[in-house]
Amino acid sequence: MGKEVFLLDDQGIKRALTRIAHEIIEKNKGAKDIILVGIRTRGVPLAKRLAQRIDQIEGEIVPVGMLDITLYRDDLTKDENDPIVHGSSIDSEINDKIVILVDDVLYTGRTARAALDALVDLGRPKMVQLAVLIDRGHRELPIRADYVGKNVPTSKEEIVRVSLMEIDKKDSVMLEGSKNVV
């Protein structure tokens, strides 16, 4: 068994989100027509934090929604107990808007694919972009993040553990089971 390696503290997360906010504004020529949609669970507080950063930079309030992808996952089996579905909550119209999906970790791409499926059931965005705090590689689907806080090459056995104040009472990103120091 490997050890835990510290990747980001609260200030590292804050800097990564500030940089992503600037990149979002630059790529989209401002914050007009943008909706941030957090993927449950940790994508939601990250989306809210990004919206705050964008407001601080641009002086424009960006709507934030929440997407529950439980029923869109391809790893649900028929034998499994009934999944707990929390429902999606996007108060703004997504048609003809730039929707930025926000998640904590991009790994195989299956969560992002499920989020795209869930999103198109809610409307037809002008464009969909993906922002992630950590990209750890090992894609199984042709999905790439538009905005990345930190690229962390990992082995498939390692686990990236993101803790956020709103859920876990602390902000940190750890790599568990690591045989190497990052």
Curated annotation (Swiss-Prot):
Motif placement: PRPP-binding: 99-111
An example molecular function term from Gene Ontology annotations: RNA binding
Lineage: superkingdom: Bacteria
InterPro entries per the UniProt record, alphabetical: PRibTrfase_dom (IPR000836), PRTase-like (IPR029057), PyrR (IPR023050), PyrR_bifunctional (IPR050137)
Transmembrane annotation, as ranges: none
Assembly description: Homodimer and homohexamer; in equilibrium.
Function of the protein: Regulates transcriptional attenuation of the pyrimidine nucleotide (pyr) operon by binding in a uridine-dependent manner to specific sites on pyr mRNA. This disrupts an antiterminator hairpin in the RNA and favors formation of a downstream transcription terminator, leading to a reduced expression of downstream genes. Also displays a weak uracil phosphoribosyltransferase activity which is not physiologically significant.
UniProt similarity note: Belongs to the purine/pyrimidine phosphoribosyltransferase family. PyrR subfamily.
Identification of the protein by name: Bifunctional protein PyrR
The encoding gene: pyrR
